[in-house]
Amino acid sequence: MCIRDSNKGIVHDYLLEKPGVLYVLCSHFHPDHFNREVLSWKKLRPDIRYIFSKDILKHRRASAEDATYINKGDTYEDEHIRIQAFGSTDVGISFLIDLQGRRLFHAGDLNNWHWSEESTPQEIRKAEGDFLAEVRELQQTAPAVDVVMFPVDSRIGKDYMRGAEQFVERIKITIFVPMHFSEDYQGGNAFRQFAESKGCRFLSIAHRGESFELPNL
């Protein structure tokens, strides 16, 4: 079982009580993606395995013995899981995860981040170029992904879905999960129509702590 990026949010007790090895992945040190509380879980689960972006160690949010740290281009692999670190257009990394015959991608802060109402044309072109370069690298390894978790953040302005649109146009996705929208569920779920037009199943999120079972992909 994997638990990715943790904020002050909700991890139901049953997740910590489920059998099997527990993996916790954190993509970078920003507080909406990393919370030191996750390190306390090892008291309940001595078998827990932490896979963190190396910037978390650099910024002294955790110590060297707390986790396995990886950078873009690194791979963590054991008898259960394979995790490849890809790039970000902010800090840290994104995760490509192969687990039990399924392939998952967690974008971290990888996105086409620009504020079209505020950014200059040059800034917009650079943001888009940097983003598409990272997507091309991922596409070479993973032209198709079963589950993608990707930012759909209306706080960046009217073109906030552009990065998500470009992503699903380039990589075949079975299930798309919006994220990074804070409490703006309507804004995150607004991507549903476009995702479904590209053949994705879209998971609409209604509240914090909502869970989904995905037995058949």
Question: Where are the language model's segments positioned?
Answer:
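Pre-active-site segment of Zn-dependent metallo-hydrolases
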Residues: R4-F29, H33-W41, L110-T141
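Metallo-beta-lactamase
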Residues: Y50-L104, L203-N216
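Binuclear metal-ion centers of metallo-dependent hydrolases, dominated by the metallo-beta-lactamase
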Residues: R61-Y76, I156, Y160-L217
